[in-house]
């Protein structure tokens, strides 16, 4: 699974871009944090990340880069953070824009260490406000979920949630409108998430490119159906195995 994710990440960053809507909600930020945390097995490190401690070590450097990517806040082409979107997240949450936000501007060399170095001073100065802005506390996260009962609850499997109430149909009598989004094969606009797809073991870059092309011209959740069907036709067993892993994870931490 890690190999699949790595290849997906590579493809998205060197190929297609993505630009998610801002502000992000608590479901979307939680997905970003948990996806990146699952790549680490050292419980001592994970405990620090869970409490928003970012020590100066190699694993944390890449964790920071991973989170910025999965929040849609890192531009591969410019090798820089999307500071205007960070500002929008703060504003949307009623949090004052930090005076040192502009310190996050500017190109990096794209390495984990460079992105960490660009981030850490701002992070240390504003960690409490960052946690509020990005729903990084249990209280803020739970408040959002209580106010948004249509979102998949924490601790509920994606498969169960999407099966209930015919959620898979979406608004266009689709087959995978709900699960394709919660597995993050597609974004909230049903556009393929290139780096996510590259993470799926058993598919070549060419397979992913071809399946993304199958979505061209499709509207709404019909695009996610076309993507899913293409992947299934390419390698049904690999797709099933990958989604089973994601489904099991969704019952534990997302």
UniProtKB/Swiss-Prot annotation:
It holds the Pfam family PBP_GOBP. Leukotriene C4 binds at residues 52, 136, 154. One of its GO terms (cellular component) is extracellular region. Coiled coil: none annotated. One of its GO terms (molecular function) is odorant binding. The keyword Ribonucleoprotein does not apply. The lineage of its organism: Eukaryota, Metazoa, Ecdysozoa, Arthropoda, Hexapoda. SUPFAM superfamilies: Insect pheromone/odorant-binding proteins (SSF47565). Keywords: Disulfide bond, Hemostasis impairing toxin, Platelet aggregation inhibiting toxin, Secreted, Signal, Toxin. It comes from Phlebotomus papatasi. Thromboxane A2 binds at residues 49, 63, 154. Belongs to the PBP/GOBP family. This is Long form salivary protein D7LC. Modulates blood feeding of female sandflies on vertebrate species by binding and sequestering different mediators involved in the host response. Binds leukotriene C4, leukotriene D4, leukotriene E4 and U-46619, a stable analog of thromboxane A2. Does not bind histamine or serotonin. Inhibits platelet aggregation induced by low concentrations of collagen in thromboxane A2-dependent manner. Disulfide bonds join 36-66, 62-112, 162-178, 174-221, 211-230. Its main location: secreted. Residues 1-19 form the signal peptide. The keyword Secreted applies. It comes from the Eukaryota. Gene3D superfamilies: Pheromone/general odorant binding protein domain. It is found in: Secreted. InterPro entries: PBP/GOBP, PBP_GOBP_sf.
């Amino acid at each position: 699974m890690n190999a699949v994710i790595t290849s997906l990440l590579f493809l998205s960053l060197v190929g297609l871009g993505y630009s998610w809507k801002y502000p992000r909600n608590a479901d979307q930020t939680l997905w970003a944090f948990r996806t990146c945390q699952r790549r680490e097995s050292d419980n001592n490190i994970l405990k620090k990340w869970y409490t928003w401690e970012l020590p100066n070590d190699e694993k944390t450097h890449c964790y920071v880069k991973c989170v910025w990517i999965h929040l849609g806040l890192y531009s591969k082409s410019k090798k820089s953070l999307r500071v205007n979107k960070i500002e929008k997240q703060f504003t949307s949450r009623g949090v004052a824009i930090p005076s040192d936000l502009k310190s996050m501007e500017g190109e990096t060399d794209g390495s984990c260490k460079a992105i960490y170095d660009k981030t850490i001073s701002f992070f240390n100065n504003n960690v409490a406000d960052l946690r509020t802005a990005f729903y990084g506390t249990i209280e803020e996260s739970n408040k959002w979920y209580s106010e948004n009962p249509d979102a998949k609850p924490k601790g509920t499997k994606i498969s169960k949630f999407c099966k209930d109430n015919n959620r898979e149909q979406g608004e266009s009598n689709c087959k995978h409108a709900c699960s394709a989004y919660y597995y993050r094969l597609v974004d909230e606009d049903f556009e393929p998430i290139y780096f996510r797809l590259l993470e799926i073991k058993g598919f070549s870059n060419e397979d992913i490119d071809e399946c993304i092309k199958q979505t061209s011209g499709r509207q709404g959740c019909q695009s996610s159906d076309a993507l899913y069907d293409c992947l299934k036709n390419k390698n049904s067993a690999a797709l099933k195995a990958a989604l089973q892993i994601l489904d099991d994870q969704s019952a534990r931490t997302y």
